[in-house]
Amino acid sequence: MVVTNQAGVARGYYGEEDVKNLHVYMNHILECMGASIDAFYYCPHHPEHGIGPYKKECSCRKPGTGMFEEAAQRFEVDKAHSFMIGDKLLDVEAGNNYGLTTILVGTGYGSGIRSQEEKEGIPPVYDFYAEDLVKAAQWIIEKGQADVR
């Protein structure tokens, strides 16, 4: 599943249909490679910079857990064996708030966050750091195999 804040909708940069079309396109690309994403959840709101009905406080916007809760109503989510992977501390905070194992990836903003933490001696608030999604997936698979033993 994908959970994503889409403040661009709230700010009027693009519409909800654009977000949905991107998700369809992403799944099409993945399906061509034998994979798929079961569901996409997005928050179109922003508490300060939203326009019209999109300017509001909500439980769906990460670090809130509304999108996770919505997914849990549709799917059987086993928190003990589920992961939140993201490139921002907001993603990690959302996963922590919902009780998931969290992974910060170095793509996007993640490597800068990691560098700053190391430079300033800040302890990580995530469970694992991975350079990219492939390394995150490998760690998840290894962790799963260790849990089975």
Question: Residue locations for each model-derived region?
Answer:
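Structural recognition of the conserved hydrophobic beta-strand(s) that form the central parallel beta-sheet
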Residues: M1-V3
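Asp-based, Mg2+/Mn2+-dependent phosphohydrolase catalytic module
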Residues: E16-A39, P47-M84, K88-R149
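A short secondary-structure junction motif
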Residues: Q6-V19
